[in-house]
Amino acid sequence: MAKTKISEYSATPASNTDISNINIAEGCSPANVNNAIRSVMAQLKDQQDGTSGDPFTVAGTLTSSGTLAVTGALTLD
């Protein structure tokens, strides 16, 4: 499966052999490394912007000062 967003990566490093269908397995083309890094950077930006469809969960304590603007649903336990 092509890993096209951050939530699709595995916590097991050896399982992450592609990024957006770009081969990053051992022995891959050096050009693939450049393309994969660019793809990860775009995926991180999509997650930051909220356009990837990935939920973002914060565990523990979140302290904020200032204004909190929420668009959509907000669940507090």
Task: Name each model-derived stretch.
Residues 4-5, 40, 47-77:
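Intrinsic low-complexity, repeat-rich intrinsically disordered segments enriched
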Residues 13-15, 31, 74:
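Intrinsic disorder/low-complexity signature
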Residues 20-23, 31:
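N-terminal alpha-helical targeting/anchoring segments
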Residues 27-48:
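Long amphipathic alpha-helical coiled-coil
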